[in-house]
Amino acid sequence: ALREIMLTHDKIFVMGHKNPDADCVGAALGIYRLSKALNKSTYIVMDKDCPAIEPIVDGIYRERADEEEDIFVTNEEAMLLKDKSAMLIVVDVNVPAMTECPELLKSISTIVVLDHHRQSNETIKNAVVSYVEPYASSTCEMVAEILQYIVDKPKLKNIEADAMYSGILVDTDNFVIKAGVRTFEAAAYLRRAGADVTRVRKMFREDMEHCRIRTAIINKAEIYMDEFAISTFDGENVSGATVVGAKAANALLNIQGIRGSFVLTALQDCIYVSARSIDELNVQVIMEKFGGGGHLTMAAAQLKDVSLSDAAEMLKHTLRKMHEDGDI
């Protein structure tokens, strides 16, 4: 169905969520390659300067050094480029407000959604195809499946295969979280397509400053109600602050007896909450209380107009109440 819809449009825009991560850009690149195989004018609407995807973007430009056109466009450029022949494929997000350019959603009539986050009340309503699979480990896994079984099998470039492999790697925390049979099948396909495990590992190594900050976040963590690890972090003037916070949340799960970990990162008048668990706690329902979402073991939320300390207290209050009500 996706291929048939793409064939009837001349311009194809691929858009992810704000503050894109490896899964977001990897999935976008996979769809980009499919679209180019169908000889379509294709544009990825994404903030290419986001620190979380910097290694991938650098690799793309190295591999595309001889090509003139830029595969990434800004929100403003996308709004100017769109016309009646355009369609929009949204990856790794299904909430309109969390997309890179919500205005684009309103101005293009043919929309396809590919995502692995569970749908909430706030979801993209006017999609002609909505492929939302909460049991998938990542959107890259879903896109890899599409690329494997579609008639016009596109030939991925090495950096594109690397990006998709890294998307699976990051979202599964190195094949530990939500990695099913189809996850490994997708990874095997990407390896055959040119993904290199060593190259991907080098791509996502931490710099020393980030390592120190992550350690500091872990050191100041508070154990709440004997089973929740909570830490806060002022991310101003730290590149990739939300990524560091998410990595710290992952690391806190290694503490014995911890059912869930939460790292709150203050950045640009917003508090970003990274929530993680292994299997005993549904962090998604907790983050939904704050207008966020995600998965059973990996979720997030953004809080506006609140201080870091107040946000931490709000989280504690919510955890205690949900625990008393038997919701967690």
Please place each PLM-identified region on the residue numbering.
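Short, motif-level signal for alpha-helix interfacial/capping segments enriched in acidic residues
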Residues: 1-3, 92-95, 148-151, 272
